Amino acid sequence: MVVKVGVAKLGNIASGVMAELLLDERADREDMQTFMATSGTKLQPEDIDRVVSNMKAWKPDFAIVVSPNGVLPGPTGAREQLAAAGIPVIIITDDVTTKKEWEEVKNSKFGYIIMKADSMIGARREFLDPIEMADFNGNLVKVLAITGAFRKLQLALDKVIDQVKAGKKGTEIELPKIVMTTDKAVDGEFTNDYALAKARAAHEIAIAVAGQNVKGCFMTKEWEKYIPIVASAHEMMRIAAVLCDEAREIEKAGDGILRQPHKKDGVLVRKTKLVAKFE
């Protein structure tokens, strides 16, 4: 059986850059296929409608809806339309900001993976040009990858694929309900305690970036004040990426990097030694 996984990208977060790639890292899996539809950078109704119509036409076994601020009308409407078409939906988004919004997500029929460290960017014109945008996202992808946040996301999605392969469909599928805290991200990722400490620090810094960018983008009006605020947030993310590099180099020095690739049938194999066969 070939499982059809739909990925609807509405706007951009770092998790959306990698969502389908994490499931088929060498493009050689034979047990699943992905279809990605995107609204581009915007969340306008016409952009959302285009994504939803293409996704419904493809008829995936389940769909992943990736967006910033997943409680906005656009992403909310998209997942409601997909669910109405009988497609199980998993939300991947950045941190949900209020208790009311969180309760609505938690009590909904949708699966969710809340990526707390997938922080918003410093989107002030006086600061953010295309290169700054790309640099920030590159640092953030590194943090989410090396801390373990991406692995936990990938494993959760693989479990859903496995359920479909086992014959489950629709409401029979158990969808993930995960808040990606620092504890959850780093769990089982490191053999060296100093590497673990650096990764924890990196993930916590990345979470804190969101607060600074909210302050700089929405709470501060004077340009001479908000420019340094958003710039400082990007410096925080850069340091988080440096800490991740340091953590990985420590793990390399002890020949302890965990590798878990997919086989062609989707089964995960693992090893922790570079020059070694899989366990």
Swiss-Prot record:
- Keywords, ordered alphabetically: Methanogenesis, One-carbon metabolism, Oxidoreductase
Q: Catalysed reaction(s)? A: 5,10-methylenetetrahydromethanopterin + oxidized coenzyme F420-(gamma-L-Glu)(n) + 2 H(+) = 5,10-methenyl-5,6,7,8-tetrahydromethanopterin + reduced coenzyme F420-(gamma-L-Glu)(n)
Biological process per Gene Ontology, one example term: one-carbon metabolic process
> What pathway is this protein said to act in by its record?
One-carbon metabolism; methanogenesis from CO(2); 5,10-methylene-5,6,7,8-tetrahydromethanopterin from 5,10-methenyl-5,6,7,8-tetrahydromethanopterin (coenzyme F420 route): step 1/1
GO terms for MF: ferredoxin hydrogenase activity; methylenetetrahydromethanopterin dehydrogenase activity
Write down a Pfam family by its short name: MTD
Q: Which Gene3D superfamilies match?
A: 6.10.140.120, F420-dependent methylenetetrahydromethanopterin dehydrogenase (MTD)
Q: Which interval of the chain is the signal sequence?
A: none
User: Record's superkingdom?
Assistant: Archaea
Report the record's disulfide bonds.
none
Q: What Enzyme Commission number(s) appear in the record?
A: 1.5.98.1
Which family does the record claim for this protein? Belongs to the MTD family.
Entry function? Catalyzes the reversible reduction of methenyl-H(4)MPT(+) to methylene-H(4)MPT.
Task: Give the NCBIfam families listed for this entry.
Answer: PRK00994.1
Q: What is this protein called?
A: F420-dependent methylenetetrahydromethanopterin dehydrogenase
Q: Which gene encodes it?
A: mtd
